Amino acid sequence: MEPINKTPVYYETAAYARENGELELFRLSHRTNIACKNDIQDAISRHFDGMHLDKATAKEVLDQYGAERVSIVLAATVQYKSWDGRFSSSNKDWAFSVHLPEGQSASGLDRRSDYIVDSHPAVLDGFIWQARKEIRERQNPAVKKETVQEAAPAAKAAKRRTHDMER
């Protein structure tokens, strides 16, 4: 699916953008990363009932911004908060495998901190799982089909075991 927001991700530094006449591209990409962060926070707050995060929460943000930008915002967040034990080791490993835009400014500030998601880390970890799963399914539709096909026999077997125990 094509994202609604088609602003390309800009991977170079602001200094590089300035030297090459691409400063507006840098700024637009950076502002879009911040908007993506805000929309992730908003989606989580609308779809988390205090105990459960709706299964389609990540899908709506991915539809808006696409896999590349959502991955960048989420990975930057986990990398920035890598000390936090509420992020799973799997999500941490994934986050450190994602190529991020250069964030260091000439003054030494990391501009990526502007798009660090501030939602509760345990809930955000669930959102990251959802996003990663949705991205995999979009990249390889067979994954979704296999998951559904594997789940049906397992559910039937569990139901059969429960029925047998009741006898």
Regions found by a protein language model. Name each.
Residues 1-166:
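Gram-negative host-targeted secretion-system effectors, predominantly Type III and Type IV
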